[in-house]
Amino acid sequence: MSLRQTVARSLPYRIARPAVRALRARLNGPSATSAPAAPPMPVYFPRTLALPEDTPEQRAIVEEVKQHSWYHTIDLGQGIRTPGRFDHIPPLHHYPMPLDLTGKRCLDVATFDGFWAFEMERRGAAEVVALDIDSWLDLDVPPYILEDFKRRGVTTKTGVGFEIAHKVRNSKVDRRICNVYDLSPEKFGEFDFVFCSDVLVHITNPIRALENICAVTKGEAVFVEGYAPGSAGMGPWITLLAQLDNSAWWMFGRDFLSKAALAAGFARVEASPDIDVRQRATPDAPMQRLMLRAINNR
């Protein structure tokens, strides 16, 4: 194999080449034979914080909200929104979640503060189960992350934000402590709709997790994950990040998730348009997300 062929097949070259092509096209302008440009990816930023303290009841809720470091921005009513790192409410219409879940049994995998579980409940679900781990030390993240937690004395139990939102919203969502590796129809039965967001890149065995989710899904599951920009058309590749000072184990290629979901047993998959949802603390950093419907219809 020539040096040129070796370089062309290397992963860095395959990752960089689409970006170089895009830059070249941008500098040179579109050619007469070039394909129509794809529509720009929608970008969503967190809204301004809303923590009014005009009434005694609002003040009591806000005081409780301020005691927690929030991952999700959740509408608690009375004009109060939690100051979450991510605000999924503005782009909510882009997510492929059915508008009407009346009578459905639903599952939220890795619920954290519970935004998606409460949203499924709001859409009429008959039952919502919210899966979570018990402690930060139960996370399946790279070992040096856990060692850092231990050095800093981080043993915090999860679910604090969930319990606050659950109480204020008068919710009936059922939060269960269970690792996704232990998820099974024997323990939980089957679900009409499953939502799983930003989980697979953070665990050692995403295929096993997909298999377990498939086993409890009798209708459809929606997966939302980050992916490598510029990786469309490069095949279902996956690369290891765990030694790069990152809380994720993996970086997925654009086509990995659909192929992995089919390999895990789902009958068919449908991709939805990607979006870019920015973090509150770093609004200038792109956070591209791919969204996939995986369907069983058992």
Regions of interest found by a model, annotated:
Residues 104-112:
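Conserved class I S-adenosyl-L-methionine
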Residues 202-217:
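A short, conserved alpha-helix within the catalytic core of class I
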Residues 195:
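A conserved beta-strand element that flanks and buttresses the S-adenosyl-L-methionine
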Residues 218-229:
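Conserved beta-strand signature within the Rossmann-like core of class I S-adenosyl-L-methionine
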